[in-house]
């Protein structure tokens, strides 16, 4: 739940939240209130599917529905995840360029390679604490709010009694927020991580076979999911708020990337806000890319009944790691084409 929630605030999500905050100001903040219970509900269901059945979402769809439905969903997930990986890696490269200078494309290659090496060659029990530590990067966006001037009374009013704009651009912005917040790859990742955790713990079985374990397991899932989704939504709210209080209030309403948002903050909110925002992009990207690539690999491997798991060695789950590697490498490669991954995700 914690890693899932933190991965939801990836660099492409940061770009979307910055875009809508800059474009619509405080009038978009209400979306964080609406998405919160929706996120909790769907992520708890996803986790329960994994814990109860001992299989991920793709494996359960394969058992109960038409294979063509499954194949269609998996193709869409693969395409979306690959574009998302491209957007995140590109954003990380651009953010690091802002921080230290140098070529953004080379940084993108380095981030992609580092992420891939970590996933393929480092055992997941040793890798998981690194992912959890990277969730601390989200607090950069909490800190950013407190170094800019915020009219809190007006913010609270607009959050709960928003002044909405009934036009196409506003509707697209709302859909973009919902789409980046409630993302399918998180469903697959959450369910598959429950399966991984259950298989790794001695004595734990799927709840269909060990119903006596249900009370403890379902309570853990509920607490974990509430904490993760609360953190995710709080950060999304603060990113939109930062963009609204700085960029929108100074007439900057057209933001295309998270790095552009960080750069625009510099003269308006100061060097510290800029550094926090930029560093957050890098940290959140390092967390999100493994989740995106991993969820794609879980989905495809479960579909074709291959051996799965980040806890397995490379040669014991070759199909799984092949999909993970291809998704990551294609994501890196897309940054060297005319395609704009951020724009593709938004639309």
Task: Spell out what each predicted region is.
Residues 48, 52-53, 70-101, 108-113, ...:
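Hydrophobic transmembrane alpha-helices that form the core helical bundles
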Residues 25, 52-79, 98-104, 226, ...:
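Transmembrane-helix boundary/entry motifs in multi-pass membrane transporters
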Residues 136-163, 180-196:
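Hydrophobic alpha-helical segments and their helix-loop junctions in multi-pass secondary transporters
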Residues 38-52, 192-200, 212, 230-260:
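Extracellular/periplasmic helix-exit of transmembrane alpha-helices
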Residues 74-75, 99-121, 137-142, 146, ...:
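Transmembrane alpha-helical segments of multi-pass small-molecule transport proteins
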Residues 67-70, 105-109, 272, 276, ...:
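Loop-to-transmembrane helix boundary motifs in multi-pass membrane proteins
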Residues 3-4, 31-64, 73-83:
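Juxtamembrane transmembrane-helix boundary signature
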Residues 16-19, 44-69, 94-96, 201-204, ...:
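Flexible loop linkers connecting adjacent transmembrane helices
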């Amino acid at each position: 739940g914690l890693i899932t929630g933190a991965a939801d605030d990836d660099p492409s999500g940061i770009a979307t939240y910055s875009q809508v905050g800059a474009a619509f100001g405080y009038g978009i903040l209400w979306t964080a209130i609406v998405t919160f219970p929706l996120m909790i509900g769907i992520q708890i269901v996803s986790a329960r599917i994994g814990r109860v059945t001992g299989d991920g979402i793709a494996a359960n769809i394969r058992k109960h529905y038409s294979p063509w439905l499954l194949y269609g969903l998996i193709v869409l997930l693969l395409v979306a995840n690959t574009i998302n990986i491209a957007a995140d890696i590109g954003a990380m490269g651009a953010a690091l360029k802002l921080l230290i200078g140098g070529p953004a494309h080379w940084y993108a290659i380095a981030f992609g390679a580092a992420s891939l090496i970590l996933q393929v060659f480092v055992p997941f029990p040793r890798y998981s604490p690194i992912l959890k530590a990277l969730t601390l990067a989200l607090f950069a966006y909490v800190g950013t709010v407190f170094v800019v001037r915020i009219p809190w009374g007006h913010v609270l009013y607009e959050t709960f009694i928003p002044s909405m704009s009934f036009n196409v651009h506003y509707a697209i912005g709302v859909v973009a927020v919902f789409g980046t917040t409630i993302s399918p790859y998180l469903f697959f990742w959450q369910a598959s991580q429950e399966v991984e955790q259950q298989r790794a713990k001695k004595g734990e079985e799927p709840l269909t076979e060990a119903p006596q374990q249900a009370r403890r397991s379902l309570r853990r899932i509920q607490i974990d999911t509430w904490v993760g989704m609360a953190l995710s939504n709080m950060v999304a709210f603060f990113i939109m708020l930062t963009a609204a209080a700085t960029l929108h209030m100074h007439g900057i309403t057209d933001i295309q990337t998270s790095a552009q948002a960080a750069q625009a903050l510099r003269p308006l909110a100061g060097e510290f806000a800029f550094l926090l925002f930029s560093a957050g992009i890098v940290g959140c990207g390092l967390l999100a890319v493994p989740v995106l690539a991993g969820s794609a690999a879980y989905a495809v491997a479960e579909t074709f009944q291959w051996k799965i798991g980040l806890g397995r060695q490379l040669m014991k789950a070759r199909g799984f790691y092949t999909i993970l590697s291809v998704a990551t490498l294609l994501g890196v490669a897309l940054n060297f084409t005319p395609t704009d991954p951020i724009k593709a995700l938004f639309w």
